[in-house]
Amino acid sequence: NVHITADCSILQHDYSWAVIQRLTGEVLGSCGTVRIGNNVFVGQKSLILKGAEIGDNTIIGAGSVVTGRLDGNAVYAGAPAKKISSLEAYIDKRRKLQLNEAVLLVREYEQTYGTRPPKKLLREFFWLFEPRNTQLDEVFQKVFQLDNNTERSQQAFVQSEPMFSSYEAFLKYVESNS
């Protein structure tokens, strides 16, 4: 259950021996293993080098260079990749930022297109305003189906409370906070 996004590379070898070969004629091969745990996200254009071990439940930011061992339940970024947050702290951060980012999305859409965005455009934010039932729009149902985690996502959704009573109530909030 690993998400490796566009333009990532995983290298289990090292061609730097070519310099040695040119200097001495020797071919001194170099290789190693790469281990990636379960429930890992690797951001775009990241590079995972030989000997890397990535623990379970790990997020790696875009453009990172992964070497050595990265413990699980954490967020890493940089070159070389360094721990920037526990996964728990990142989840708390996302819960706090979600509303502001949804508002920003609506404002940017309105500014660009001169009209309110269709509800379906906010497919990552529907937890903020959709009633708690399983009779959701197909676009939102598909979000549940990502990662073959439909049942767990639906259960979490139904057991949670929306911040707004409807999409219209959410849009009124956006208007009143402009």
Q: What residue spans do the PLM features occupy?
A:
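Hydrophobic alpha-helical segments of small multi-pass membrane proteins
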Residues: 32, 62-65, 75
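Beta-rich strand-turn-strand
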Residues: 45-59, 64-68
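Flexible, glycine/small-residue-enriched loop-and-beta-strand segment within the central core
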Residues: 1-53, 79-80, 85-88, 92
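Residue-identity detector for threonine
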Residues: 5, 24, 33, 58, ...
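Short, well-structured beta-strand-loop connectors
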Residues: 42, 60-61, 76-77
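Terminal amphipathic alpha-helical/low-complexity segments used for targeting or macromolecular assembly
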Residues: 81-178
